[in-house]
Swiss-Prot record:
Family assignment from sequence similarity: Belongs to the RimP family.
Job of this protein: Required for maturation of 30S ribosomal subunits.
Any one Gene Ontology BP term: ribosomal small subunit assembly
Pfam families: DUF150_C, RimP_N
Main location: cytoplasm
Subcellular location: Cytoplasm
Name of the protein this chain belongs to: Ribosome maturation factor RimP
Xref: SUPFAM superfamilies: YhbC-like, C-terminal domain (SSF74942), YhbC-like, N-terminal domain (SSF75420)
CDD domains recorded: YlxS_C
UniProt keywords, alphabetically: Cytoplasm, Ribosome biogenesis
GO cellular component: cytosol
Length: 152
């Protein structure tokens, strides 16, 4: 996790948790001169649009006061959704047995994109089976990971 994301996580997660939600993850996407700060929240009985609005208002106040982002940005508060992103080893461990799509920051064994069965977590690695090959992907190399929803 980059130091900017760690700083934002440390600032925003306590606010989200104080409101009774779980901070599922944070993404900060630079898009030219304007950036996007996307905050995913969750709770046991699911997230409604009103929940996102409540959290967004509180986070906006904190961000205005603390001013951790020097450039222009848009704050977006969202539920993780069906194709939920995975940020932590704990989240990967909770979704063992599901199909995942993973993009790496840099190539690993000659590739950056992996789509397959999430087999487990070993120390700091995520274990993914693609076809008949098992890959141990270092968590620090993962740029983006999502569950692939099943519609059975």
């Amino acid at each position: 996790m980059s130091s900017k994301l760690e700083q934002l996580q440390a600032l925003l997660a306590p606010v989200i948790e104080a409101l009774g939600y779980q901070c599922w993850g944070i993404e900060f996407l630079s898009q030219g001169r304007h950036s996007l700060l996307r905050v995913y929240i969750d709770k046991a009985d699911g997230i409604l649009i009103d929940d996102c609005e409540i959290v967004s208002r509180q986070l906006s106040g904190v961000l205005d006061v603390e001013d951790p982002i020097s450039s222009e940005y848009t704050l977006e508060v969202s539920s993780p959704g069906m194709d939920r992103p995975l940020f932590t080893l704990e989240q990967f461990a909770a979704h063992v047995g599901e199909q995942v799509k993973i993009k790496l920051r840099s190539p690993f064994e000659g590739r950056r994109n992996f789509q397959g069965l999430l087999r487990g977590v070993e120390e700091q690695d995520v274990v993914v089976q693609v076809d008949d090959h098992e890959y141990l992907l270092p968590i620090d190399l993962i740029d983006k990971a999502n569950i692939i929803p099943r519609f059975d």
